[in-house]
Amino acid sequence: MRKHLLILFLLAVALTSTAAPKREFRGAWIQCVNGQFEGIGTEKMQQTLIYQLDELQKDGVNAIIFQVRPECDALYESNVEPWSRFLTGRQGTAPYPYWDPLQWMIEQCHSRGMELHAWINPYRAKTKGTNELAINHIAVTHPERCFDYDGLTILNPGIPANRNYICRVVLDIINRYDVDGLHIDDYFYPYPVAGLDIPDDSQFRLYNNGITNRGDWRRHNVSLFVKQLYETVHAAKPWVKVGISPFGIYRNKKSSPIGSNTNGLQNYDQLYADILLWINNGWMDYCVPQIYWEIGNKAADYETLIHWWSQHASARPLFIGEDVERTVKNADLKNPDKHQQAAKYRLHQELPNIDGTVLWYAKAAVDNIGNYGTMLRKHYWNTPVLQPSMTFIDKRAPKAPKKLKPVWTPDGYILFWTAPKEGKDWAAKAHRYAVYRFAKGEKINTDNADHLVAVTTNTFYKLPYATGKDKYTYVVTALNRIDNESKPAKKKVKL
C-alpha cells in the first residue's frame, strides 16, 4: 500500500512540475537587418509578414518584437529620422506603394491576440553594409556626436545630448503608436575588437562628472540612458512595457564572485552594460538575456547560464532568448538521437523565475527547422496563457464583466457578456478577456491554468455544444493592458 501511495505521490509531483503555466511570455524577434525585407516592395513584404505571423500564431506565440530602428532610421513614418534602407533599399526613400510597417504590424498582431513590442537599437547609427546616409540622418547633421568603430558608426553614449535625442525618438513612437512594449537589444558600447580603442577621450574629459575610471564612466553613461528611457516611456504611457535583451553573460566568475562559471565576453566589462543594476533598480519591466549557446558549450554552457540568470535576475520578469538554429543543431547530451529543444524546455519548467521565452529568430521557427515549430504548437505552447504579471507597474484591475448570457445564433451557441463600466484611467479599462470552463463539481479556481480555454478581445465566446446534457460553469474575467485580472463573472450552461 505504501509503495502504491509513493508512486501516486511521485506521479502527482511530476504532473505538477510540468503543468501548463497560466502566465507566460511567448515571443519572437522579427528583424530587418538580415535583409529579408530590403527592397522587396510593399506587397511582397506584407505577404511575407502575414505568413510569418500566421505560422507564429499557430506555434502559440503571443508577442512579436519587431525591429523598427536598426541604425537611427525608421520602419515607420517619422519626422525625426529617415526611412530605413532595410525597408526600401535606400535610406530616406519612402516605401511605394506607401505604407507604415509599424502601424500595420500593430494592427496585424493585435488582430491575432499578440502584443507588438517596437524594437530599437539605441546607439547604432550605421551598420557595416550602409554606404549612403540620408541628409537628415543624425550622423550627417551631428557628426560630432558620433564615433566610428570597426565599420560602424555609433552615437557616443558619453554625450548627454544623445540620451535626450534617443528618448525623443522613443517618445515619438510611444505617443503616436499603440505599441505594447519598447524593446532594446544588446548593442550599447560596441562589441570590442582587439587593438581598437573607443575614441571617447574628449568626451571623458568634458563629461566625467568626477568619475576617474573610464569603464565606470561608460557604465554610468549607459545606466543614465536606461533610467531616462524607462522614465520617459512610463511618463507617457505607463502600460507600455520596457524590455532589454542583453548579451547572455553578465560577468565571468574570474572577474567577479557573483559571475557565472563561464569564459566569454561580458556585459559589464566589455559592453559597459550593468544589467543587474538596472534590474534591481526597476529600470526595466522585463529582461531577455540572449542565452544562444547550447547545453554543454565549454565557454558558455546554456544550463549554467540559465541557472545564473534565474538566481540573479528575479527582481523583474525574466524571459530567455533562445537561438532556434543552434538548439536544433546540437544533440541532447542525455539523448543524442534528439536535439536540445526538449532539454532546454525542461529547464524552463524546472527553474524558478523563468517567465517566458523569446525566439531568435522568428523565421527559423516559421521554417520549422528540426520540427521546432511543430513541437511548440503540439506540446509546449498549445494552451492559451496570459502575459506575465507586472503588478509593480500598477496593481489595479478592471471590474468584472457583466450580463453573461448564452444565446443560440446562426453561428452556434454563443456566450455573450457586457464590458464592465470603464474606470477613469487605463488600469481600470477592460482591454481583453479570459474565459475559463469548469465541469460540474469542479472547484472554481481561475489560478488553475488547465481551465483557461481562451483569451480574447471579443465580448463573446462560441460554446462547444454537444448533447445539452453536460453541465458546466463558464467564468469570464476582464484584463487591462498589462493583463491584471478582474474578479470572475460566472454562468452555468448545459452543453
Where are these regions (language model features)?
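Active-site neighborhood of glycoside hydrolase catalytic domains
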Residues: A161-V169, N175-I184, F188-I291, G296-A315, ...
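Beta-strand-rich modules
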Residues: L463-S486
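Pro/Thr/Ser/Gly-rich low-complexity, intrinsically disordered linker/stalk tracts
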Residues: N371-A427, D483-L495
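Catalytic domains of carbohydrate-active enzymes, especially glycoside hydrolases
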Residues: Q47-A74, R176-V179, L277, W283
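Substrate-binding cleft of secreted/luminal carbohydrate-active enzymes
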Residues: Y272-L276, N280-K298, S314-F392
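Aromatic-lined carbohydrate-binding/catalytic grooves of carbohydrate-active enzymes
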Residues: G60-Y96
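Active-site-adjacent "subsite" loops/lids of carbohydrate-active enzymes
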Residues: R23, Q31, G35-Q47, A118, ...
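Aromatic- and acidic-residue-enriched segments that line the glycan-binding/catalytic groove
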Residues: A74-G89, R124-D150, D186-N209, K253-L265
